[in-house]
Amino acid sequence: MLFRSKAFSHSLNQLNEGDELLIQFPMLHHSFFTTSLVKKARRRGVKIYFIIHDLDALRFMNGQAVPLKHRIRMKIQESGLLGAADGIIAHNPIMKSVLVDKGIAEDKIVSLGIFDYLIPNFEEKTGLSKNQPIIVAGNLAQEKAGYLYSLPAEPAYNLYGVGFDESRALENENYFGSFLPDELPAALEGGFGLVWDGDSAETCSGVFGEYLRYNNSHKASLYLASGFPLVVWKQSALSHFVLENGCGIAVDSLHELKATIDNLSDTDYQDLLESTKRIGKGIRDGHYLLTALNNLK
């Protein structure tokens, strides 16, 4: 850890007054030393910004897998390091409010809205309909996506990713295997992309499910950039973005999903597709990060 702190210190020392540095958070290796190094760089006139990918103290605050003393240490380190920055890019207004509650100045924080997702050689999907299977991409293991093993009989689901227990596959699940990130968008087939975590189809539950109340899942950006409207948990932070931008639907339970889709007219679905195309282009163009960076200054 000391070696890594020295390496980070050496990198910061290469920067001069007026230089700006954007750091992805959480850093792979950080400690209490990191906060003092950031403060030292700022005193020399270097601007330090963080873009948040995860808040581990928030993600694991109720999880028993992480010992209490480690959770307390995590919380102190996160608050100290983020508080030392010139500016922070949070996922959304809900995450921003959590950071303000931690004592970080509100005017230092901007909301990203949604993560960008660059797709080389993008080709627009055609022939999409509301009755095609629901797409689930990502970590399909029991501990992350246990709900996959207790889904209602309808609608059908197309699964892409690692960790899926094929011996427990349901009749309405089609597993396509895993793909390289650049190959995945072209491989996806379906009518909606699902953002759901936890062990229950009734609601998003457990450490990963509860975390959706605060964070923006990267898979949401994958789906939208690929041209698919979203299905999200109604209590997730992401539901606000989805409903305000008309790029998907929100449900409390996956047991409601078939009826919700059935109640959509073909015109309703086409409207979702048009909004998804608009949002997806912005995501592929890097619009959301560029806007957030401009709003920091």
Residue map of PLM features:
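Short N-terminal targeting/anchoring amphipathic segment
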Residues: 12-33, 46-49
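Conserved catalytic-core segment of nucleotide-activated headgroup transferases in glycan assembly
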Residues: 115-189
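Membrane-proximal helix-turn-helix segments that form the acceptor-binding/catalytic region
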Residues: 10, 39-43, 67-88
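A charged, aromatic-enriched C-terminal amphipathic alpha-helix characteristic of glycosyltransferases
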Residues: 126-127, 252-297
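Active-site proximal beta-strand in glycosyltransferases
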Residues: 20-22, 41-61
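Nucleotide-sugar-dependent
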Residues: 186-226, 232-240
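A short, active-site helix/loop in glycosyltransferases that binds the activated sugar's phosphate group
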Residues: 60, 80-109
